[in-house]
Amino acid sequence: IIDCGERLGDGQAYKAVNQLLCSVHIVAAAEALSLAGRLGLDEESVLAAMTAGAGQSWMLADRGPRMLAGLDAPVASAVGIFVKDTTLVADLAADLDIDLALLPVAARRFAAAAELGLARR
């Protein structure tokens, strides 16, 4: 359990920050593994190297193997959840007049996946 402060709503604010990072990290991980494959590299070897180096993130280590396993991999959090969460974070950013340049990119990727019928994956 993490103490998120005394003010009402601080826990939700922490969650928004977390979801921004998670959304962007998942998309970055997918693009990195896609690049590795297009370069003719063994994606599993690249994943092992990246999770041991400066480019590692929890999402890369957790979701990377599932990405390589394909659609039969167990689902940890559905695409539809990220569609919802990126929308909530985007609304919050608009209210605060803050430019979160990577968020719209991640949001479009999740929305595109949902449109392909992967919202529950």
Give, region by region, the residue ranges found by the protein language model.
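General beta-strand structural signal in soluble alpha/beta enzymes
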Residues: 2-5, 102
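Helical "substrate-binding/catalytic lid" subdomain
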Residues: 10-121
